[in-house]
């Protein structure tokens, strides 16, 4: 069917999402969120170092002397 566009019906769920009250995260979700934030912070720090001097960053992790 070349030249014909198919239109998909929009979900009615999106109309009701704003009306639903926000539920607080479960304790496990809060802990996972905190762990994720820590990882994100570490990755941001690594990105910053790589942007400034990638060669020095790599040298710091190269094993020297067969260790």
Swiss-Prot record:
It comes from Arthrobacter sp. (strain FB24). The N-terminal unstructured half of Pup provides a signal required to initiate unfolding and degradation by the proteasome but is not needed for pupylation, while the C-terminal helical half of Pup interacts with ARC to target proteins to the proteasome. InterPro entries: Ubiquitin-like_Pup. This is Prokaryotic ubiquitin-like protein Pup. Is modified by deamidation of its C-terminal glutamine to glutamate by the deamidase Dop, a prerequisite to the subsequent pupylation process. Residues 1-47 are annotated as: Disordered. Residues 25-61 are annotated as: ARC ATPase binding. Residues 1-11 have a biased composition (Low complexity). One of its GO terms (molecular function) is protein tag activity. Pathway: Protein degradation; proteasomal Pup-dependent pathway. One of its GO terms (biological process) is proteasomal protein catabolic process. Belongs to the prokaryotic ubiquitin-like protein family. Keywords: Isopeptide bond, Ubl conjugation pathway. The gene is pup. Strongly interacts with the proteasome-associated ATPase ARC through a hydrophobic interface; the interacting region of Pup lies in its C-terminal half. There is one Pup binding site per ARC hexamer ring. Protein modifier that is covalently attached to lysine residues of substrate proteins, thereby targeting them for proteasomal degradation. The tagging system is termed pupylation.
